[in-house]
Amino acid sequence: MELLNIKNLDLAGKKVFIRCDFNVPMDEFGNISDDRRIRSAVSTINYCLDQECAVILASHLGRPEGEVVDKYSLIPIARRIQHLLRREVDLASDVVGEDALKRASELKSGQVLMLENLRYEAGETKNDKELSKKLASMADFYINDAFGVSHRAHASVEGITHFFDDKHKAAGFLLQKEIDFLGKIIQNPVRPFAAIVGGSKVSGKLEALINLLPRVDKVLIGGGMAFTFLKKLGYDIGASLVEDDLLEEAGRIMDEAKKLGVKFYLPVDVVVADKFSEDAISKIVSYQEIPPLWMGLDIGPATVRLYGEVLSDVQTVLWNGPMGVYEMDKFARGSNKIAHFVADSYATTIVGGGDTADLVQRIGVDDEMTFISTGGGASLELLEGKILPGVASLIRKKG
């Protein structure tokens, strides 16, 4: 799909609102542990500054649920952006309050203003029209460079676009790059095409799994979500994470895979622990022998070998979601091994999702991946063939 191009806008000396995705992982001390998403936005910001624009940056961080929560403040983000841009970044104390509106109206060419966390406003996730209008009133132009949230119909992503005509809005360089690359994979993936899907819950990836099945040849399941599938097959999963309300859906996914001839793999062994802790007692067991009150926190070595074999002949790999609780060293081995399998393959490799991107960076194989998407849910929805809400109004109209 062809998007409205930032280079076709007459930005010189104007005020530009850039929706970025600075929802980056933070450590327990409030430090940024992976600034990839921040660095990815710099080219669009610098392009606007080169046009002598006054730049307003907006993002969310975490899920403050419409309230001001200090730990979700964008103070560390503004500090990091300031370092990357090598110029002062002014942080407003609110989103569309008196302070933000005053600073936005007084912003001069070459200056950068960052609004506080968009999700401090309850209307952001509700796609509130009044909030969209207030955000739009701050600038002459709107740029969406937040691929990671473009699957959300939120005020700063979708609602705001209705207050700008096609000559005053466009995709940023990062959004364009993501759409272009993933679009090629959708249209013509080199086969066999495997999807590795992990993470804690089926619920967040249920629809994506259903819609991906007709497009892929193999699906490899890991992470906490595997136990919902195993329970549906009748196995005792102890105290492992399970979504009982989705057991029927899990069954439907497996039935659909069988019908389509898609090979659907589940773990054959797991690393279980007596509690969710780094100092837990752990052991490796078959998926048929998970003890009562123990929980599965990683895939086991037999599963790692099986998945390595399954991936040995694939030509395209989409990986979304870790294989276990990779944040704890004791339960990171499965994810780390799969990361090395993917990195060492000759396949086109696409990594999607913040946790998976964080994982491959932690173990130093990020440069071996063909493409690391800044969006997890967004990349899955795009690969399903959906038009993302944040992209829909940025598509160039024919004729």
Curated annotation (Swiss-Prot):
One Gene Ontology molecular-function label: phosphoglycerate kinase activity
Residues annotated for substrate binding in this entry: 21-23, 37, 60-63, 119, 152
Catalytic activity reported: (2R)-3-phosphoglycerate + ATP = (2R)-3-phospho-glyceroyl phosphate + ADP
Annotated compartments: Cytoplasm
EC id: 2.7.2.3
A single cellular component GO annotation: cytosol
Membrane spanning residue stretches: none
Pathway: Carbohydrate degradation; glycolysis; pyruvate from D-glyceraldehyde 3-phosphate: step 2/5
UniProt keyword list: ATP-binding, Cytoplasm, Glycolysis, Kinase, Nucleotide-binding, Transferase
SUPFAM superfamilies attached to this UniProt entry: Phosphoglycerate kinase (SSF53748)
InterPro entries: Phosphoglycerate_kinase (IPR001576), Phosphoglycerate_kinase_CS (IPR015911), Phosphoglycerate_kinase_N (IPR015824), Phosphoglycerate_kinase_sf (IPR036043)
Gene3D superfamilies xrefs: Phosphoglycerate kinase, N-terminal domain
Catalytic class of the enzyme: transferase
Single GO BP term: gluconeogenesis
Keyword Ribonucleoprotein (UniProt): no
Organism domain of life: Bacteria
Chain sites annotated for binding ATP: 205, 296, 327, 353-356
Subunit record text: Monomer.
Similarity remark: Belongs to the phosphoglycerate kinase family.
Annotated protein name in UniProt: Phosphoglycerate kinase
Species the sequence originates in: Sulfurimonas denitrificans (strain ATCC 33889 / DSM 1251) (Thiomicrospira denitrificans (strain ATCC 33889 / DSM 1251))
Encoding gene (name): pgk
